[in-house]
Design a protein with these regions (language model features):
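AMP-binding/adenylate-forming catalytic core of the ANL superfamily
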Residues: 115, 121-122, 130-135, 288, ...
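Conserved AMP-binding/adenylation subdomain of ANL enzymes
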Residues: 216-239, 243-286, 301, 370
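Structural core segment of the AMP-binding/adenylate-forming
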Residues: 75-76, 99, 103-173, 496, ...
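Gly/Ser/Thr-rich phosphate-binding loop
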Residues: 172-175, 258, 285-290, 299-362, ...
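Conserved pre-ATP/AMP-binding loop-to-beta segment of ANL
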Residues: 41-43, 157-162, 175-197, 204, ...
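Conserved ATP/PPi-binding loop(s) of AMP-dependent carboxylate-activating enzymes
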Residues: 369-372, 384-418, 456
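AMP-binding/adenylate-forming catalytic domain of the ANL superfamily
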Residues: 158, 514-538
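Conserved AMP-binding/adenylate-forming core of the ANL superfamily
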Residues: 41-99, 116-121, 170-173
Length: 546
């Protein structure tokens, strides 16, 4: 039996008492995910290509391909510590690139294909990315921004010499020309692994730099919120969430491979619930991570358990609180399928959650602290611990500092603000703890919007809106939405009184989609004569919400 980070415990209480982070002295995630398993010829990835159909990849296949890509990157000058962007959807080339990076000692920068040119440029430029591997769907955006990213020397596009145009290298050609069998970088849990970008309310997105221990933290949490069912060769996992999102990349894909399980990859635009059910039926998916928005869409299909021959055992969800309506629907619709909500942050790993094997889940509750973490509810002003039932800021302390982030990239002052002097990490999330130890989410302490499982910083959306010449000022907030949890609403102060409101709404939405991401456009737009501001001219978003 291969080593895994989280042993099995009979009870939640015993796990908290006995578990400790016994991280190995040497650790390279590429080796852990691919080479440690008893049978590396077993299927690691089942990929449904929209054009060519089903492709299967064993752990050996992924090892050989990532070896070749690592050799090709090294041949082009990529070295340990260099940042390499990954702008690829749920395709094999996504994890192959991450694995190749770590074999070289390079640092991955996961980015979603949903990003527009401004969002991509900011992140590639801020991370000082030397190279980027991209899907053809973002070709135009990359071509537009390449000259504005001074450190970006290498662009590799998925495809072969017949399909890749411009100055980009063809992914398929590089792999065919390279030789496998490179010397894997001697890494430890402290070796830098990735820079992930998170949105904030008071500034541009921040790069969150993690070390390799990140993936062990994600794997431990996943073992618990997937109800200890990650058995090698038995469990098959799928998520509709983009593999650029931490809970999908680390908490599903790489967590599955740490445990020797199979993952389904399926790059699709949008989410169709009937297609999702059919996919889970075709691949005998046992375990799925579903953001709440996806679950609400699945509810629209009548009698799915009768219409589809499903193998589902466990559902997990995160990104926003689940309503009792969704939880009740799962319990009533699927026989013996557990649904476990969990909570985490890009910076802090996945730290709180439900596990039906251990304790009764409470609809809407974040759950209880996972083994390896202590939590407190603090007074936001005094930082003193609050009693049961009182709302305060959630603070978390890991049993091993390394499973949390190392720093905000290039922002030491922001890094210092995230942690107290005695080692507690602050979340900016307001919660309370009940008498039974369950934690309940109340709201963000800042203005970040939770929409369809994504965290959206209002400032970035406001700046995109202001690129429209007819927008004088803009304020962005989240408003309740039955499907998305929250929807983005923009209050726009037009530059003149002479404007066509329908046309301007359409143009603003298209502008934000193009510059940022599909999920960041304002669903609702209201035009106002004047926006509420502070004495220093800052938008008072709280007034807009009221």
């Amino acid at each position: 039996m291969s080593w895994t980070v989280m042993p099995t415990f009979e009870t939640h209480e015993r796990a908290h008492e006995e578990f400790s982070w016994e991280l190995p002295d040497e650790f390279n995630p590429a080796v852990d995910f691919l080479r440690k398993h008893d049978d590396t010829s077993r299927t690691a990835l089942r990929y449904e290509d929209p054009d060519s159909g089903l492709e299967t990849y064993s752990f050996d296949d992924l090892d050989e391909r990532s070896d070749r890509l690592a050799a090709a990157l090294a041949d082009r000058g990529v070295e340990a510590g260099d940042r390499v962007g990954v702008v690829v959807p749920q395709k094999p080339q996504n994890p192959i690139t991450h694995l190749a990076n770590w074999k070289l000692g390079a640092v991955s920068v996961p980015l979603t294909v949903l990003f527009g040119r401004d969002a991509l440029q900011y992140r590639l430029e801020d991370s000082d990315a030397t190279a980027v591997v991209v899907d053809p769907s973002v070709r135009e955006a990359i071509e537009e921004i390449r000259d504005d990213c001074p450190s970006l020397e290498i662009v590799i596009e998925l495809g072969d010499a017949d399909t890749v145009t411009g100055d980009a290298d063809a992914f398929d050609e590089l792999l065919a020309a390279a030789e496998p069998g490179i010397d894997v970088y001697d890494a430890t849990p402290e070796t830098p692994t990735a820079i992930m970008y998170t949105s904030g309310s008071t500034g541009p997105p921040k790069g969150v730099r993690h070390s390799h221990a990140l993936w062990l933290g994600r794997a431990a949490a996943a073992y618990n919120y997937f109800d200890h069912g990650l058995e090698p060769g038995a469990a098959t996992l799928w998520t509709p969430a983009d593999w650029a999102w931490g809970a999908a990349l680390g908490g599903t894909l790489f967590a599955a491979w740490h445990h020797g399980c199979t993952v389904v990859g399926w790059p699709r635009d949008g989410f169709d619930p009937e297609d999702a059910y059919a996919l889970m039926e075709r691949h005998d998916v046992t375990t799925a991570f579903m953001p709440p928005t996806a679950l609400r869409l699945l509810m629209a299909v009548d009698d799915p358990e009768q219409a589809y021959d499903l193998s589902l055992e466990t559902l997990a969800s995160a990104g926003e609180p689940l309503t009792s309506e969704v939880v009740d629907w799962v319990e009533e619709t699927f026989a013996d399928v557990a649904i476990n909500e969990f909570y985490g942050q890009t910076e802090l790993n996945l730290v709180v959650g439900n596990s039906a094997n251990w304790f009764e889940t409470q609809p809407g509750s974040m759950g209880k602290p996972f083994p390896g973490y202590e939590v407190r509810v603090l007074d936001p002003e005094t930082r003193t611990e609050l009693p049961t039932g009182e709302v305060g800021e959630l603070a978390v302390k890991p049993g091993d500092r390394r499973v949390f982030f190392d720093e905000y990239w290039k922002r030491p002052e922001k890094t210092a603000e995230k942690r107290t002097d005695d080692g507690w990490f602050l979340t900016d999330d307001l919660v309370y703890r009940d008498d039974d130890g369950y934690l309940w989410f109340v709201s963000r302490a800042d203005d970040v919007i939770l929409t369809s499982g994504y965290r959206v910083g209002p400032m970035e959306v406001e700046e995109a809106i202001l690129h429209h010449p007819e927008a004088e000022q803009a304020g962005v907030v989240g408003v309740p939405d039955e499907t998305r949890g929250e929807a983005i609403k923009a209050y726009v102060q037009p530059a003149t009184d002479d404007y066509d409101s329908d046309r301007l709404r359409t143009e603003i939405r298209e502008l934000v989609r193009d510059r940022l991401a599909e999920y960041e456009y304002p669903k609702h737009i209201a035009f106002v004569d004047e926006l509420p501001t502070t004495s220093t001219g800052k938008i008072q978003r709280r007034s807009l919400r009221e």
